[in-house]
């Protein structure tokens, strides 16, 4: 039997990412043959990964990588936040973003077939990571964005990589593009413009806003405050020319009733119309980038600010770790606790 030296174990660990004991055991079983040991570890890793396949992985990181005129943002999941800080996991996320930006796959299936720096496919790399790290590690999704030479990428990660954003702007510069991405990270828009919002979605969100007003009015009534009116509209898509014209007529009637002289109406009406637009586009403000108040200049919306500097947003992608994933009640941490309790003979 070949001597299993510390140098041999170290070499296998560097090539496979396996732990010391797993590497030593594999070398013993393969009589010191590095290549056979790697294959054995891979087979065992696949078996371990298969056992973890049904677990919920809702923690993790995003990765962002810019490759010339192509940028990628990815989300990679683990079962616990602790593992998401592991250096091997971080390297895997960054390598994934890089190969996707360079390979430009059309979907997850094509992405999983890409070759990683290790020579493995992306899919095999995740199987290996699951085996060596000891948790389910999964590649969830990616977005690819391309730009022209005249446009600028804004790449930004927030909260230790839990949020990843890429934006493309026309005009301005890279610094402005990054500021826009910072805004996107903080304010969570889902689309660029109100034109992208579904009509039924707007109606449902408006109903939720009015329900919140009803609840607020109950509290106001208890302290003798007047009730707030319901919102009639939630999006610019609902503000037809007729609706806007009627709002202006209502304002004029209000000014007349207050006895305001007509010669000063032109100074008052624009401000009141701005207020009307603000009050009746709450859904837009929550979900559309251009309608949101810009965090770098709260006197303007994002759209107004960009217009003031002759710039525009072309496209953006925002990923937040775990969004849309329903965590099972019996997650990994609970499973560990249950296992420990069982070992101690507790219920």
From Swiss-Prot:
Keywords: Cytoplasm, Elongation factor, Protein biosynthesis. GO terms for cellular component: cytoplasm. Residues 80-83 are annotated as: Involved in Mg(2+) ion dislocation from EF-Tu. The keyword Protein biosynthesis applies. Gene3D superfamilies: 1.10.286.20, DNA helicase RuvA subunit, C-terminal domain, Elongation factor Ts, dimerisation domain. Disulfide bonds: none annotated. It holds the Pfam family EF_TS. GO terms for molecular function: translation elongation factor activity. The keyword Cytoplasm applies. Its main location: cytoplasm. It is found in: Cytoplasm. Belongs to the EF-Ts family. This is Elongation factor Ts. It comes from Streptococcus gordonii (strain Challis / ATCC 35105 / BCRC 15272 / CH1 / DL1 / V288). The gene is tsf.
């Amino acid at each position: 039997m070949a001597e299993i030296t510390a140098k041999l174990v170290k070499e296998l660990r560097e090539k496979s990412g396996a732990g010391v004991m797993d590497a030593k055991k594999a070398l013993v079983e393969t009589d010191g043959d590095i290549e056979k040991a790697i294959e054995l570890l891979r087979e065992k890793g696949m078996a371990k990964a298969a056992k973890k396949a049904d677990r919920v992985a809702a923690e993790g990181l995003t990765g962002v990588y810019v490759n010339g005129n192509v940028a990628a943002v990815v989300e990679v999941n683990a079962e616990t936040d602790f593992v998401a800080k592991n250096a091997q996991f971080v390297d895997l996320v960054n390598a994934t973003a890089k190969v996707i930006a360079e390979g430009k796959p059309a979907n997850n299936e094509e992405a999983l077939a890409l070759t990683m720096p290790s020579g493995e496919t992306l899919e095999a790399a995740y199987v290996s990571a699951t085996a060596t790290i000891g948790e389910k590690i999964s590649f969830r999704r990616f977005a690819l964005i391309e730009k022209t030479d005249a446009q600028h990428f804004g790449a930004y990660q927030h909260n230790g990589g839990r949020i990843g954003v890429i934006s493309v702007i026309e005009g301005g510069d890279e610094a402005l593009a990054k500021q826009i991405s910072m805004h996107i990270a903080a304010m969570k828009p889902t689309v660029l413009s109100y034109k992208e919002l579904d009509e039924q979605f707007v109606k449902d969100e408006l109903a939720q806003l009015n329900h919140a007003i009803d609840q607020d009015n109950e509290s106001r009534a208890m302290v003798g405050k007047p009730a707030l009116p319901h919102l009639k509209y939630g999006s610019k898509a609902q503000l037809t020319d007729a609706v806007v014209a009627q709002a202006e007529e209502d304002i004029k009637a209000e000014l007349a009733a207050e006895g305001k002289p007509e010669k000063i109406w032109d100074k008052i009406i624009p401000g009141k119309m701005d207020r009307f637009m603000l009050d009746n586009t709450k859904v837009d403000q929550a979900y559309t980038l251009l309608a949101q108040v810009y965090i770098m200049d709260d006197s303007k919306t994002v759209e107004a600010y960009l217009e003031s500097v002759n710039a525009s947003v072309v496209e953006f992608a925002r990923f937040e770790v775990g969004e849309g994933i329903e965590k099972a009640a019996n997650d990994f941490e609970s499973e560990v606790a249950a296992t420990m309790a069982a070992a101690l003979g507790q219920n």
